[in-house]
């Protein structure tokens, strides 16, 4: 019998041993047992290699600005586990989390006696989110972020009002495939019959796959750069400025408080989705509320300044495309700085390419590791590097202390990156 929050979390985390098991049969079985809570939800579904979390955040802030109560389901968490299921940006309470576990545990145990096998950790958390938003907290809208891929992701049992595929890049190839087409096909698996799809995917081969799936499902397709366009882009001192042209109107002088051209693209996708829903009378929102919403958006761990002396930025880039976005943001806003990098990543990432890219901008690069089952050893990363000013320490707190001791000049800055799991630990430590 689970009675405390700690027991509830332990029970959830114990599901980790079941790994990642693509497929929706277990989800469908459990949802049927719980009387289909997902059917009570006005959902927006977000997939893609990078930018999902930021896109979810832009959507939430716009809808909140219009007075709506908005649920979000995201992963991984940055500060507390509960933030994976949030309402208006606030994680649900420990009591609510415990009650959800008490409710789903018997269903999960019954599932184990079927030929479908055991539910994974991610499946259990997804079921809890459906239950919470479907029956326990009457929110107006819920934005669901996929965990991995799309077609067989446990969130893909939802029937959304609109779907978004942020972009297509190389990540989780062991599960999603090695080519752009294979990865795009997995992401395009979220496209539902007659549900519009909005995408920032750029590769011709990826767009071909998405277009084919959209045609098959009779889903209207809106492609960034075609049906809606970013114009008049300009980097600002503390953000980005741009104009967005959509089929439903032009938004001039849009401003973001988040840095990087990739954030302009994420915001454009979110604005396009809200424009579509407004046009179809699925929600009521003014252009001013949309503009204000995206301007107010912040997303922890995404190019976030956590210290001023020395200037220290943490960024959750965890694959080659994420590192590319990080580097272009640094070149755009901090090109005259000496950048001291601290890097750690997971075993299943293309670390060699990430290290090579980072070396092009680094005054120094320090490799470290962190307490996580799939974290890569600092020594392995160090061996990949050919940088003339490289260093390693398996303990990340020591690595940070070492770099901060060195970064004392006016132009020195520290950038910590490589994994969302890593920067979530670092963030808590640096903001203490």
Language-model features and meaning:
Residues 136, 141-146, 153-164, 168-172, ...:
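Nucleotide phosphate-binding/pyrophosphate-handling subdomain across enzymes
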Residues 59, 151-161, 427-431:
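Short Gly/Thr/Asp-enriched flexible loops that form oxyanion-binding sites at enzyme active sites
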Residues 203-212, 216-222, 311-314, 320, ...:
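C-terminal helical cap/extension that packs against the catalytic core
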Residues 1-48, 55-68, 73-75, 109-117:
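Short functional linear segments
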Residues 31-32, 36-39, 65-158:
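ATP-dependent carboxylate-amine ligase catalytic core
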Residues 200-201, 215-235, 256-261, 289-296, ...:
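Beta-strand->loop->alpha-helix junctions that form or flank phosphate-binding loops
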Residues 419:
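Active-site-proximal loop/hinge segments that shape catalytic or ion-binding/gating pockets
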Residues 150-151, 158-218:
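Conserved catalytic-core segment of NTP-binding enzymes
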């Amino acid at each position: 019998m689970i009675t405390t929050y700690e027991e509830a979390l332990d029970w959830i985390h114990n599901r980790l041993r079941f790994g990642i098991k693509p497929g929706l049969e277990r989800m469908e079985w459990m949802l049927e047992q719980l009387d289909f809570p997902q059917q009570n939800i006005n959902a927006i579904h977000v997939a893609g290699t990078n930018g999902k979390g930021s896109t979810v955040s832009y959507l939430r802030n716009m809808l909140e600005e219009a007075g709506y109560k908005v649920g979000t389901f995201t992963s991984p968490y940055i500060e507390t586990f509960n933030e994976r299921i949030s309402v208006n940006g606030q994680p649900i309470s420990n009591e609510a989390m415990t009650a959800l576990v008490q409710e789903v545990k018997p269903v999960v145990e019954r599932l184990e006696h079927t030929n479908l096998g055991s539910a994974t950790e991610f499946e259990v958390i997804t079921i809890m989110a459906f239950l919470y938003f479907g029956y326990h907290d009457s929110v107006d809208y819920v934005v669901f972020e996929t965990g991995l891929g799309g077609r067989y992701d446990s969130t893909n049992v939802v029937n959304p009002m609109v779907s978004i595929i942020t972009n297509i890049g190389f990540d989780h190839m062991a599960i999603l495939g090695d080519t752009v087409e294979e990865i795009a096909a997995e992401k395009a698996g979220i496209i539902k019959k007659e549900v519009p799809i909005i995408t920032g995917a750029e590769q011709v081969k990826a767009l071909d796959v998405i277009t084919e799936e959209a045609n098959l499902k009779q889903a209207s397709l809106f492609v960034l750069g075609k049906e809606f366009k970013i114009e008049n882009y300009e980097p600002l001192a503390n953000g980005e400025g741009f104009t967005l042209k959509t089929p439903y109107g032009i938004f001039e002088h849009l401003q973001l408080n988040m840095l990087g051209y990739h954030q302009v693209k994420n915001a454009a996708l979110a604005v396009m989705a809200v424009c579509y829903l407004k046009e179809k009378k699925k929600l009521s929102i003014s252009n001013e509320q949309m503009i204000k919403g995206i301007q107010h958006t912040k997303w922890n761990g995404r190019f976030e300044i956590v210290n001023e002396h020395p200037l220290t930025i943490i960024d959750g880039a965890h694959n080659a495309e994420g590192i590319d976005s990080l580097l272009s943001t640094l070149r755009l806003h901090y090109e005259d700085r000496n950048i001291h990098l601290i890097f750690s990543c997971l075993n299943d990432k293309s670390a060699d390419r990430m290290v090579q890219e980072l070396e092009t901008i680094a005054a120094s690069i320090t490799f470290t590791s962190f307490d996580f089952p799939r974290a890569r050893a600092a020594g392995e990363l160090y061996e990949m590097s050919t940088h003339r000013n490289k260093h390693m320490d398996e303990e990340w707190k020591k690595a940070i202390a070492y770099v901060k001791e060195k970064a004392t000049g006016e132009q020195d800055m520290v950038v910590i990156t490589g994994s969302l799991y890593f920067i979530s630990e670092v963030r808590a430590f640096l903001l203490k």
